[in-house]
Curated annotation (Swiss-Prot):
Cysteine pairings via disulfide bonds: none
Membrane-spanning segments: 14-34, 72-92, 162-182
Assigned keywords, A-Z: Cytochrome c-type biogenesis, Membrane, Thylakoid, Transmembrane, Transmembrane helix
Family stated for the protein in its record: Belongs to the Ccs1/CcsB family.
Pfam families xref list: ResB
CC terms in the record's Gene Ontology section: plasma membrane-derived thylakoid membrane
The protein's name in its UniProt record: Cytochrome c biogenesis protein CcsB
Function field: Required during biogenesis of c-type cytochromes (cytochrome c6 and cytochrome f) at the step of heme attachment.
Annotated compartments: Cellular thylakoid membrane
Keyword Membrane: yes
Protein encoded by which gene: ccsB
Self-association and partners: May interact with CcsA.
């Protein structure tokens, strides 16, 4: 039993909790720097050639589970360890401290009051009358008063003692919510072109919701850089009326526990006309080797596929650059503009179809995280409330009042308030 108590004492140590908080904060910072939940090939390709911080390559990153840090075994273990430390601290320290604060302490001898942080002795004409007067004054100021025939005890701000326990409770709820979200949360990233739909299924395979992208627009600055993306979505729940919602960056859609973020944009297709052919909508592919935001396609100019040209663009506004097989620029084409003859064929770009990058997240732990955060804030605010206590003993033989006081914070403020109370009693019964 002694060994178990020693283990509990170590686990509930404040220094350990602070160290765990710092470790979790540092790990969370790493998670915001490194890409999360990407394909393993990305980490191997990117970090084997250029190790992170010059130390950790792609293989080590996967081995340490840094590709899914927030759901990694060691990160969840840190959360569980901190939660256990907080619960033990609450059980061993905060709860007994709250119980002790709720109990009335009955001092019966003046000598006991003289040892308190604040102590005064007041001479008066009638000590019993002064005691009753002081009790009335304290009650009028919002103090709780417990009065006996020759003494009283009063206190104010006991609610402040609940604060630390609420802080611990809120942090534990927050940790549980974070762990639950990491283990049971779902995340899906998809690019949708206007008119395309995405069906979301429940675990049984039934259609739960259909998302249709009705429109997608990109707002650009004068230099052509994307400033804002906006998607108009139609939500079609089975057996219910459709809903139309608009989302943009920093303005997500929340629907039945799911959050849809406007996360990115892309180019889906280019519509071209070759000679007198009908309009052809051709899919675009990314070319990372040419740049971060470069899309293009290879277009043959002969029936046998020979003499191909490469069409590339970086914006839905164009231009579309046309390159020959030797890499030389042939021409630039504007969407909706005039066509140009390329390798003997009239080529015209009708338009470029952008795609909306949507991030869908379902995190069942969010309500617990929000509740824990709110309780933690409430507990922190209550912890700032000073708990003040006053004891008064009437000495009817010598017609004196012996007054003592304690305060857990802002002792100077209490030291200024106590003489004011004494002066009021002195005036009435001096």
């Amino acid at each position: 039993m002694r060994t178990l108590n020693r283990v509990f004492a170590i686990l509930s140590d404040l220094r350990l909790a602070i160290a765990l908080l710092l470790l979790i904060a540092a790990a969370s910072a790493v998670g915001t720097i490194l890409p999360q939940q990407e394909a393993p090939e990305l980490y191997l390709e990117r970090f084997n050639a250029d190790p992170w911080l010059g130390l950790i390559n792609g293989d080590q990153m996967l081995a340490f589970q840094l590709d899914h840090l927030y759901s990694s075994v060691w990160f969840l273990a840190l959360l569980a360890w901190l939660g256990l430390a907080l619960m033990l601290c609450s059980w061993r320290r905060q709860w007994p401290a709250l119980q002790a604060a709720m109990r009335w302490i009955d001092y019966t001898r003046p000598r006991q009051l003289s040892k308190l942080a604040l102590a005064e002795t007041l001479s008066c004409a009638s000590s019993d009358g002064a005691l009753s007067s002081l009790a009335i004054e304290l009650k009028s100021r919002g103090w709780q008063v417990k009065q006996h025939q020759d003494r009283l005890a009063a206190r104010r701000g006991v609610v402040g003692r609940v604060g630390p326990l609420l802080v611990h409770t809120g942090l534990v709820l927050l940790l549980i919510g974070a762990a639950w979200g990491a283990l049971a949360g779902q995340r899906l990233e998809r690019f949708l072109a206007p008119g395309r739909s995405l069906d979301l299924l429940d675990p049984a395979g039934a259609n739960r919701l259909s998302l249709t992208l009705e429109n997608f627009s990109i707002t650009r600055d004068p230099a052509g850089r994307a400033e804002q993306f906006q998607s108009t979505l139609t939500l079609s729940p089975p057996g219910q009326e459709d809903e139309r919602r608009t989302i943009s960056v920093n303005h997500p859609l929340r629907y039945q526990g799911m959050t849809v973020y406007q996360a990115d944009w892309s180019l889906a297709a280019v519509t071209v006309q070759i000679g007198k052919s009908p309009m052809l909508q051709l899919p675009l592919s990314t070319f990372p080797e040419l740049g971060d935001q470069v899309w293009g396609l290879v277009l043959p100019t002969r029936p046998d596929g020979s003499e191909p040209v490469f069409l590339s663009t970086s914006s839905e506004q164009g231009p579309v650059q046309v390159f020959g097989s030797d890499g030389a620029l042939i021409t630039n084409l504007r969407p909706g503009g005039e066509g140009t003859e390329v390798r003997g064929l009239p080529l015209k770009v009708i338009d470029i179809l952008p795609a909306s990058g949507l991030l869908l997240k379902r995190d069942p732990g969010v309500p617990l995280v929000y509740a824990g955060f709110a309780i933690t804030l409430l507990g922190g605010a209550l912890s700032m409330v000073a708990t003040r206590q006053i004891w008064v003993i009437s000495d009817a033989v010598h017609q004196r009042l012996h007054i003592g006081g304690l305060c857990n914070r802002n002792l100077l403020g209490f030291a200024a308030e106590l003489p004011e109370l004494i002066n009021r009693v002195d005036v009435s019964h001096g």
